[in-house]
Amino acid sequence: MPGQVAGTRDRRDSRWDEHRRERREQLVQATLTAVSKHGAGVGMDEIAAEAGTSKTVVYRHFADRAELYVAVCTRVAAQLLPKLRDAMDSGGSPRGMVAAAIDTYLTFIEGDPELYRFVVDQQTLDRPTTDPLTSLSDLVGAQVAAAITVALQQAGADPSPAAPWGHGVVGMVRAAADWWLRADRPMPRSALAAHLTDLAWAGLSGVVSTKEDK
């Protein structure tokens, strides 16, 4: 009998945990929709209204706005990273891989600038949190570094600079993308992507490119 009671309790706990996970995902999706409707400065009342509930219910699932913010950023990173990987995989040459990654990142920003602003701007949070793009930038930097490593090895060159170069490219692109958005996109995305690719490749081509890439 005690075993049956424990088993019933475990099943109830499992169902409740699953319900909580599903409800959190629904609230994250509601936040994304609310950001699209109301902009990066969306309030918790607007998020709750989009979810068809109250702020009290939202705070049952997220301790504060910062926790919800981190969950949204995690969702954004999970959606963006596979696109970046696919773009790099289809890039072909090392230069093509760098160009594809840069354009994919800028396409994300251009497609939903308010969501990007929501992700990078923490001024509306009730407590500070870590930069949500740091982990994503680290992952992307590692991907770029891996591509550079292969190219260096193929060229018979020392692969040790690949990591700082890969992360340096990502940092440059992020800084330029932030400027582009703040300046109200003074040039087309394609032009910015081409300029950044040219600048990045000017530093890399001497040691990683083939004659066809130069």
Where are the regions that the model predicts?
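Short hydrophobic clusters on alpha-helical segments that form packing/core surfaces
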Residues: 27-35, 80, 84, 105
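Short secondary-structure transition hinges
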Residues: 100, 107-146, 156-161, 186, ...
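Basic, helix-initiating cap at the start of DNA-binding domains
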Residues: 1-50, 67-70
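Amphipathic alpha-helical packing segments from all-alpha helical-bundle domains
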Residues: 128-153, 163-171, 175-178, 191-194, ...
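Hydrophobic alpha-helical connector segments
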Residues: 71, 86-114, 166-169, 193
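Short hydrophobic/aromatic patch on the recognition helix
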Residues: 52-62
